[in-house]
Regions:
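ABC-type nucleotide-binding domain
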Residues: 1-207
Length: 207
């Protein structure tokens, strides 16, 4: 609706900006080799795809050379390791086509873990924790902030709770950037942000 996802697609050059420039590391993205650029960006969508195969095989789609230890670490950060170990076959559990035999929240966490195995410079979470509860959402964000601080994290979300501890928040409205700031700054200066925050808190924070 407000072009949040389109803005992100400019980074990996699924689209090119018609005016101005998008810079990564201070360099216009159009100056990078396209394959090299996309190798450094991992995007987790709200409805990412799992294929028929084991959990281990699905995870290695992000990095075919990933070790078992690296997979387990990525799953711990994505809050997936615990539920995987509850399956009788653990990481060898068979996933049906499209992830039909796991919940929406489990699927999202597996996709986040898979993206982490790519070891990207930029990690984009495009509404990709929408199916997990607010506590798990918070645990994922805390783990990413603590254990991969050198990775730039871009979080697209409807829930302000998912972004309010970000270094910088971009408010999108009607396909344009409406405001940029921290949570505290936007609460003071931006009517749209303040109204959304108030309405979500009244509704319990899950809107």
């Amino acid at each position: 609706g407000s072009s949040k996802s389109t803005l992100i697609q400019l980074i990996s050059r699924l689209y090119d900006a018609t005016e101005g420039a998008v810079r990564v590391g201070g360099v216009d993205v159009r100056s990078y080799d396209l394959e090299a650029l996309r190798d450094q960006v991992a995007v987790v969508l709200q409805k990412n795809v799992l294929f028929s195969g084991s959990i281990r095989e699905n995870l290695r789609w992000g990095n075919k050379d990933a070790t078992d230890a690296e997979m387990e670490e990525a799953c711990r950060l994505a809050q997936a390791d615990e539920f995987i170990r509850q399956f009788p076959d653990g990481y060898d559990t068979h996933i049906e086509q499209g992830g039909a035999n796991v919940s929406g929240g489990q699927k999202q966490r597996l996709c986040i873990a898979r993206a982490l195995l790519k070891k990207p410079k930029i990690l984009v979470l495009d509404d990709s924790t929408s199916a997990v509860d607010t506590r798990t959402d918070a645990l994922i964000r805390q783990a990413l902030r603590r254990y991969i601080p050198e990775t730039t994290k871009i979080i697209i979300a409807q829930r302000i709770a998912s972004v309010q501890d970000a270094d910088r928040i971009v408010v999108m409205d009607g396909g344009a950037v409406n405001a940029v700031g921290t949570h505290a700054e936007l609460m003071k200066t931006n009517k749209i942000y303040r109204e959304v925050y108030t309405s979500q808190n009244k509704a319990g924070g899950d809107d």
